[in-house]
């Protein structure tokens, strides 16, 4: 049984004056909405133990269409690793830690500097955001080390949320951290690039951004994801501009934002070289492999929960 912590901490103060009944209803709806996207609670409802079986999935949450829960017999599972990064990744990993405890072999999460460290069995590195830093790189190297240990029969939980791109930035060969930082500064603060456009560039320049699956071999990969856009929206944060050549897409973004010439020489040379081993994941790299993806947080969670609670309270809500 999961007990939720109240989100609105000053509830009593807010109910101490004015139209108390009206406030109570409004705050009740707001509390339901604010609590719904909590990554810890949602992961606890998705990842659970049923005897000696590890069950992952919860059809009650918004998941990819057709995604049914998957089950693993723990007696037949080897090592269990937990890795990832993002501003909500610690909460995701904390839920897994509380479910699996000492069944977790090891792990590494990169979280944002300023956060408190919440994990006990899983390593945590506090790294830079929105500009990656040395800690982003050192923590990402640790993640890569763990991913490369995984073998058939092992399970790798990948916890990803907003901010993971900078927090787990490990530059590709030939591009320094300083050069990668300059790319972020130019795109974000100079050109004002939107997220899909920025991702089209920066995901090429780091070893793992959107490419974690490349390094897990034949191990089972269970991705626990949050997204900032509702699933029905056409544009998703991880999508890239249409292009038959993804490297061309990155180059086109830089030219369209008039910042190609502002890019460090190493970045321009890397993109023009079009090395496929560092490009986006190819379908054949993961086809037929035991990879599962579960979405545990999105903005529609808040809206849908608030709507349900309003109707439960007898309001004519739409």
How does the language model describe each region?
Residues 71-76, 81-115:
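Active-site cofactor/substrate anionic-group-binding motifs, chiefly glycine-
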Residues 95-104, 121-123, 148, 171-182, ...:
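A glycine- and small-aliphatic-rich helix-loop capping segment at beta-alpha/alpha-beta transitions
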């Amino acid at each position: 049984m999961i007990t939720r912590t109240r989100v609105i901490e000053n509830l009593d103060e807010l109910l101490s004056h004015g139209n108390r009944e009206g406030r109570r209803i409004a705050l009740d709806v707001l509390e339901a909405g604010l609590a719904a996207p909590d990554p810890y609670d949602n992961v606890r409802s998705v990842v659970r133990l049923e005897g000696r079986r590890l069950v992952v999935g919860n059809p009650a949450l918004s998941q990819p269409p057709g995604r049914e829960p998957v089950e693993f017999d723990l007696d037949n599972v080897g090592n269990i690793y937990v890795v990832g990064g993002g501003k909500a990744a610690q909460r995701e990993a904390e839920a897994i830690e509380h479910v699996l405890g000492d069944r977790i072999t090891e792990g590494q999460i990169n979280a944002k500097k300023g956060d408190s460290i919440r994990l006990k069995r899983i390593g945590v590195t506090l790294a830079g955001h929105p500009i990656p830093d040395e800690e982003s790189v050192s923590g990402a190297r640790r993640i890569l080390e763990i991913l490369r240990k995984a073998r058939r029969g092992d399970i790798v939980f990948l916890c990803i949320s907003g901010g993971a791109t900078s927090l787990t930035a490990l530059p590709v060969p030939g591009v320094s951290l300083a050069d990668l930082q300059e790319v972020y500064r130019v795109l974000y603060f100079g050109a004002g690039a939107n997220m899909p456009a920025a991702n089209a560039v920066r995901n090429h320049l780091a070893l793992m951004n959107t490419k974690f699956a490349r390094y897990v071999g034949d191990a089972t990969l269970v991705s626990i994801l949050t997204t900032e856009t509702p699933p029905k929206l056409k544009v998703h944060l991880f999508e890239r501009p249409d292009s038959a050549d993804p490297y061309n897409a990155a180059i086109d973004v830089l030219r369209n934002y008039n910042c190609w010439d502002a890019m460090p020489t190493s970045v321009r040379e890397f993109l023009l070289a079009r090395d496929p081993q560092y490009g986006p994941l190819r379908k054949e790299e993961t086809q037929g492999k035991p990879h599962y993806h579960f979405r545990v947080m999105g903005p529609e969670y808040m809206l849908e929960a608030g709507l349900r609670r309003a109707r439960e309270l007898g309001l004519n809500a739409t």
